[in-house]
Amino acid sequence: MKHLAIVIALGALLMLCCNCSFMDKMYAAQKIDQAATPVPFTTLENYFVRNDVDCSKQQRLIIDNKADFERFFGMAAHMGGMPTEVNWNKQFIIALVMPETNRATSIYPVAVKTTDNNCLVFSYQVKKGDKLSHTMVPFTAVAVNKPETRQEMQIFFLEK
């Protein structure tokens, strides 16, 4: 019995340690978001996640060229208009792809904000709805102007 208690305590400590970096990043993103300046962005419309992309877990993507973008997304012009144009010379993409689900799920971009010390926060909201008779891959993607400096930028994702 004593050994079981020790194993459980060690397991709990291990889980706490593994979650610390996630919680630290979440806390940092919230603090940066509060002090940051809004950045204009364009929500990408009429795209879909390709069916050969692994959608078993959440993916946070930063894409700066068309070839990489096309590895993840396809154009869905038949779904109500032309896909949003991206100027790859001036813009990059921040995308969030959630795991495949059988629930109606929408992801809405809330804001993109930046700080003086090269941090960018992409905040979004997730709305889950009713159960579906099929599966879907919820995602959102926004185009943001590339920074004028070539300095490394740290990007945080923050669910609101």
PLM features: residue spans?
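Positively charged n-region of N-terminal signal peptides that target proteins for export
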Residues: M1-A5
